[in-house]
Amino acid sequence: MGKISSLPTQLFKCCFCDFLKVKMHTMSSSHLFYLALCLLTFTSSATAGPETLCGAELVDALQFVCGDRGFYFNKPTGYGSSSRRAPQTGIVDECCFRSCDLRRLEMYCAPLKPAKSARSVRAQRHTDMPKTQKYQPPSTNKNTKSQRRKGWPKTHPGGEQKEGTEASLQIRGKKKEQRREIGSRNAECRGKKGK
């Protein structure tokens, strides 16, 4: 007695075989090679199981998953951590020696920082500005002192003259003349008293 098979199964087999025969005639041997190669890699990756991540691959995966938040290599301990707890394993132990999935990687991402309120941003603005350089008085070397005694115009550190230097020089000149006159009068008075 022959095998009993249903009509749809026989039709499927015939149609499938005919389809493959037509395809076989039109496919080149290189196409068949690439098709077989794809099937082998697909089946080997499906049976290999989850992949482990170590070293630079692990860091790249964490950076991709966590983004700007950053990540920890050890699970961050909370405020109430106690020494009685079992030693915690790190991401390397979990993902390098065993398989690791996306949820496990996300556990090591740093928490999102809360958005700052408008008040704290305003209060922080003055601290974000770069510090200005402190004013340094000009050096007091002999040339500068002699220039001041001679009544030369003062200059800013940038080399520019102060506004109104001509007027201030005239005032200084008048004051010097007044001092000389007072000094000469005092000398005359002293000379008369000594006689």
Curated annotation (Swiss-Prot):
Record keywords, A-Z? Deafness, Disulfide bond, Dwarfism, Growth factor, Intellectual disability, Secreted, Signal
> Where do the record's region annotations for C lie?
78-89
| Region feature (D) | 111-118
Q: List the disulfide bonds.
A: 54-96, 66-109, 95-100
Oligomeric state and interaction partners are given as: Forms a ternary complex with IGFR1 and ITGAV:ITGB3. Forms a ternary complex with IGFR1 and ITGA6:ITGB4. Interacts with SH2D3C isoform 2. Forms a ternary complex with IGFBP3 and ALS.
**Residue span(s) of the pro-peptide:** 22-48, 119-195
- Describe the effect of residue 98 to W: Found in a patient with primordial dwarfism; uncertain significance
| Role according to the record | The insulin-like growth factors, isolated from plasma, are structurally and functionally related to insulin but have a much higher growth-promoting activity. May be a physiological regulator of [1-14C]-2-deoxy-D-glucose (2DG) transport and glycogen synthesis in osteoblasts. Stimulates glucose transport in bone-derived osteoblastic (PyMS) cells and is effective at much lower concentrations than insulin, not only regarding glycogen and DNA synthesis but also with regard to enhancing glucose uptake. May play a role in synapse maturation.
First and last residue of the signal peptide: 1-21
Q: Which SMART domains match?
A: IlGF
Q: Which family is this sequence assigned to? A: Belongs to the insulin family.
Q: Where is this region: B?
A: 49-77
Q: Which GO terms describe its molecular function?
A: growth factor activity; hormone activity; insulin receptor binding; insulin-like growth factor receptor binding; integrin binding; transmembrane receptor protein tyrosine kinase activator activity
Question: Compositional bias (Polar residues) at which positions?
Answer: 133-144
State the name under which the record lists this protein: Insulin-like growth factor 1
Q: Which residues cross the membrane?
A: none
- The answer to keyword Zinc applying to this record is no
